[in-house]
């Protein structure tokens, strides 16, 4: 259509993979880094970096992104994820202050802090996945759903087929040593990217917001979300379409939703939580993976920019 086009690139001699998906290509807001201006932001792509081997974006696509130079790409480490897309751990939201945006990062550490707070408040038996099951099947002779095992199925779809979720509580999560170890590993992966993003986008800690998140490792040792990943949201100006996390419910309210609202709404953002378990989360995606947002073009013309 008018003012809208596309480019088709495909490799001749190598197979494509999930890292070639456009969930693995993001663009930062405009930034200034060490005196250099990036008026159209910088391209972010996920890779196997810093590992010498692993999945990478196919050569022709990667080379195409690097060749345009105006939005000089930043390569991040995303191969630790089962799908491998960087939008599973980082996104940006607009603000009306001088910075004009915040970077959001998925944070297992923030989730564990929140759960420990609730446990100390006497809410350790608050249930997760309220109205959703957490196992492929039910225990023989019982109507209860099982908590996901330490290295269970890769697909979260297998975790939501039951009906009774009373066994998945804050106490249960906090007592799962294997899950804790896995999330310590995930946090280290995210922290590696945090340092890269701070350096390459000129960010300070005050420019970053940590959203509570939990992950599990699949049988290949790759991470998948333990509950719907709120970072993989749709950003529509001040309105955020956030995957409903189905976190522990205490006092009739999900503590994850409450914490996310407390972090984002003071910035003038409106949080709307959308259920996407059946439609996207069960296939290792979230609502953002099945939507396409048409952005308003920058007033600044890219051809006026000197790389």
Report each predicted region and the residues it spans.
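Histidine/cysteine-enriched polar flanking segments
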Residues: 1-307
